[in-house]
Each structure stands twice: as C-alpha cells, then as structure tokens.
C-alpha cells in the first residue's frame, strides 16, 4: 500500500498502530531514532516547521493513547486550518473521516457530510478536531476538547461535543 492509502486507513479507522508507524517514519526522515522519543521529537519539530507554535505540547507517543500527552485545541485547529489551505497538507484533510459517511464519524450525531474531523477518546477526554463549512459558506477549522470527563461519562461528553460542532455547521453571521 502507498503511504497515502495507509494515511487514509489510519484516519478513517483511527488506527493507533499505523499512527505509531508514521511517527517512526517521520523520525527516520528527520534524522531521529525510530523510538517513542525520536518519533515524538520529530513530529513536534515537523509541526513547528510549519509555523505552528508547539510550546507546552507534550507527546510521549504518536498514537495519542498516552495519558501523559498534552496538546492544545489551538494547535489541532491550526493544523486543521493548514491542511485546508496548504496543498502539500491537503491529503491529511482528505483522509479525515466525514460525518455520517465513514470511520469514527459514521454514527456520530453530526450533520451528515458536513464535517471532516478526527476523533479522540480516552478515559477522561473526548475531543474532535477538523473542518466544516458554516451555513453562510465559510470554511472553519475547529478543535473541541472535553477534559476531566467523569468515569462513564464519555458518551454524554461526545453528545455535547457533537452538539457544539453542529452549532458551527448551522452558524450564519446573518442570523
């Protein structure tokens, strides 16, 4: 499979194994060791080279599974915006699941076909980052995170995240 095909699979299926592999490939390409530390260092260097502020970001893996990871919603929204505006990053945007159509957004309560985004769910965190077009035709990048979700509360948090994203889809500056 091509890297593009693997990226599509990793995003749609939310494959932690593939994202770890991509981290190792980035490490090798940037002259780092293909280890957790090398991958996370290389990924942060790569993101910073795009002009995105990575200060305060802590990565201990590239799958997003580590509870020690710390990443801001702003950083994720900036990456989503860049993927929509930079042709070199467009494959990342295209690989994201589409609401109501595929992957981790297939059965979310989000307006079908209107959102491309990546989900993130851990024990006490629910997040969604991507792009949508508002009712008045503006393309917007977003990232929303619910942190400190009570045990057993991920489903309810996800419903609130979906409701917030739907408010972006239906937003119109004209009222």
How does the language model describe each region?
Residues 55-175:
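C-terminal soluble interaction/assembly domains
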Residues 1-90:
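A small/polar active-site loop signature that marks catalytic segments
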């Amino acid at each position: 499979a091509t890297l593009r095909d693997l990226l599509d699979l990793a995003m749609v299926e939310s494959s932690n194994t593939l994202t770890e592999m991509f981290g190792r490939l980035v490490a090798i390409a940037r002259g780092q060791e293909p280890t957790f530390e090398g991958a996370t260092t290389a990924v942060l260097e790569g993101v910073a080279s795009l002009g995105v502020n990575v200060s305060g970001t802590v990565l201990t893996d590239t799958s997003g599974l580590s509870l020690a990871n710390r990443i801001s919603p702003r950083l994720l929204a900036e990456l989503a915006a860049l993927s929509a505006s930079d042709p070199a990053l467009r494959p990342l945007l295209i690989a994201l699941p589409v609401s109501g159509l595929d992957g981790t957004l297939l059965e979310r309560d989000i307006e079908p076909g209107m959102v491309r985004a990546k989900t993130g769910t851990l024990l006490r965190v629910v997040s969604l980052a991507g792009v949508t077009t508002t009712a008045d035709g503006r393309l917007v990048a977003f990232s929303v995170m619910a942190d400190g979700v009570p045990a057993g509360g991920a489903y309810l948090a996800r419903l609130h995240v979906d409701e917030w994203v739907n408010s972006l889809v239906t937003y119109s500056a004209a009222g």
